[in-house]
């Protein structure tokens, strides 16, 4: 059995602050489950161009608000209780809300190692 808290993760390299968000990588590749679970806080008033070329991601919003935009310009408001799935390695814009952070639980397949970091200075977007 694996039991971990957000507090436990903050003292490890599986707590990643990549500028526009923080991510607690609660379950990673080394745990052998075949997927990762992350608790991510997308900071209010931030925009990140992202793409997961090596992972599929499902996100469930547990608090706050924000939005995700696909590369066709479709904008999807995300609030508590909403889910979005990047099932085609979709490049996307991830935005925190205007007044509130967006809090997500994310599932990655295949799993993350836990130390991946977004690099937001690439005009083509951050990928891993």
From Swiss-Prot:
Pfam families from the UniProt entry: Ectoine_synth
Keywords: Lyase
Organism: Bradyrhizobium diazoefficiens (strain JCM 10833 / BCRC 13528 / IAM 13628 / NBRC 14792 / USDA 110)
First-level EC class: lyase
This protein's record includes keyword Lyase: yes
Reported function: Catalyzes the circularization of gamma-N-acetyl-alpha,gamma-diaminobutyric acid (ADABA) to ectoine (1,4,5,6-tetrahydro-2-methyl-4-pyrimidine carboxylic acid), which is an excellent osmoprotectant.
EC identifiers of the protein: 4.2.1.108
Coiled-coil blocks: none
HAMAP family associated with the record: Ectoine_synth (MF_01255)
Pathway membership, UniProt: Amine and polyamine biosynthesis; ectoine biosynthesis; L-ectoine from L-aspartate 4-semialdehyde: step 3/3
Transmembrane segments: none
GO MF entries: ectoine synthase activity
Family: Belongs to the ectoine synthase family.
Protein name (record): L-ectoine synthase
Catalytic activity: (2S)-4-acetamido-2-aminobutanoate = L-ectoine + H2O
InterPro entries, per the entry: Ectoine_synth, RmlC-like_jellyroll, RmlC_Cupin_sf
GO biological process, one term: ectoine biosynthetic process
């Amino acid at each position: 059995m694996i039991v971990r808290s957000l507090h436990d993760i903050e003292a490890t390299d599986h707590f990643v602050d990549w500028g526009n968000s923080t991510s607690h990588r609660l379950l990673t590749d080394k745990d052998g489950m075949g997927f990762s679970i992350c608790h991510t806080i997308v900071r209010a008033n931030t925009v990140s161009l992202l793409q997961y070329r090596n992972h599929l991601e499902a996100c469930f919003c547990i608090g706050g608000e924000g939005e995700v935009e696909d590369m066709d310009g479709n904008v999807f408001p995300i609030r508590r209780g909403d889910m979005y799935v990047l099932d085609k390695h979709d490049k996307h814009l991830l935005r925190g809300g205007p007044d509130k952070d967006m809090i997500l639980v994310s599932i990655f397949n295949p799993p993350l190692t836990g130390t991946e970091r977004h690099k937001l200075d690439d005009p083509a977007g951050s990928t891993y």
